Amino acid sequence: MMKILLAFILILALFFIVVMVIDCNRFVIREYRCEDKRLKKPLKIVQLSDLHNKSFGKDNSRLIHAIREQNPDLIIVSGDMYTSLPEKETIAAQKLMEELAKSYSVYYANGNHEQKTREETEEFGSLYEDYRKKLSGMGIHFLSNEHVYLKDYNISLYGLEIHRRYYRKFRKQILGADRVQEYLGVPDPGSFHMMIAHNPDFFEDYAAWGADLVFAGHVHGGLMRL
């Protein structure tokens, strides 16, 4: 009986390993439609998040091809495009951003990995500053607790960057709409409010602040609420 149980556990473990390997080497396109009378005209957005320096094909050729087929009006990046480990670098993320910036407007808000490399300079040196400088030079717009107004669409696009303590796994912090307002100010009246916020745990607070549509990431496999 014990041998059967061990064999079952082994088969189950191998199954999940195979699934993980397959999942880490593919991407899925999911489409969502949002309508609001405040929007002046249709807008197609592609969101990228949590690639952690992953390449799908040489220099992300498969991913870039899929994005071009979508023909977006702009691209939103919601953080963690590289991994904050000392032996890691940002080349794959840089090359992808460079290629996309040639054809599209790109708006980028940091994830916790970008924040870590920016704040812990003793460990990472100028990695973040070099990365951001290169991307800004490509025309990519970084939004760190600031916003831009997209006049053609009547959209106010905000990039929220919260303190890293809000990413703690076992001691969840309370954020609150008031704290979001301290970061971003009062939302612009009359426009449609889009927010790039890497951490999805605080959707209720983002909505209470005034966000109409939030682009998040961080949890990779999705968020489950019981």
Language-model features and meaning:
Residues C34-L39, A66-R68, Y158:
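Short beta-strand-to-loop junctions in surface cap/lid or active-site-entrance loops
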Residues R38, N53, E114-L213, V219:
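Conserved catalytic scaffold of divalent metal-dependent phosphoesterases
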Residues L85, F203-E204, L223:
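Short, solvent-exposed loop/turn segments at secondary-structure junctions
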Residues I29-E31, I45-L48, S144, L157:
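Hydrophobic residues on conserved beta-strands that form the core of alpha/beta folds
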Residues K58, L223-L226:
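Alpha-helical membrane-targeting segments
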Residues M1-L39:
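N-terminal membrane-anchoring alpha-helices
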Residues Y107, A216-G221:
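Non-cysteine beta-strand/loop elements that form the S-adenosyl-L-methionine
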Residues K41-H141:
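Membrane-embedded segments
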